[in-house]
Amino acid sequence: MSDLSAKKQELIDQAENELREIAVNIVPIENKNDPSWERGAQDFLYGLMLAMLEDSLNPELGMTKEKFNFYNLAKIATYRDPDPDNPFGTIREYCGGRDKLSKVQSLVSTVINNAPNTTRSYMGVLLSRISIFQDGGICYATSFSDMLFDDFVDQPTALFIKVPDEKESRHCIATMCISQLY
């Protein structure tokens, strides 16, 4: 493996780890007695983010840095085909046909390849957590950033995050921002 290939793989591995952390922050495991619903929703979200990451590696697919954002993630996650017998056909197609080493298909299959009632339960958990990304202010705030977290802690820095206490649904945004510093 060349030095360039090794560096590329290292960056991909780092991005995958960060995407997993983001999925964990958006859909934390709160039900310790039966974490399967939250874990499935978390894996589905992580799988979609990995699909977007894979697409960003191929310029022909058009997944640019500007398009790789929470708004588009929420749009993909909530997309349903009009066919009541196959509401996830487009998502299945989007996630299928990937490289044989891709984790995407195995991560999303629990949600999209299950009985309709089971799928609805997973999606119920997910939709309650990602509904925040339908908020115009959140879409704007998360669609770009001029902060570089890679060198953020190289010198003394103060970060102020203003999140209203009464808007608990926005707390995960602050959590994700802070976790990126570590």
Predicted regions and their residues:
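P-loop NTPase motor domains
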Residues: M1-Y182
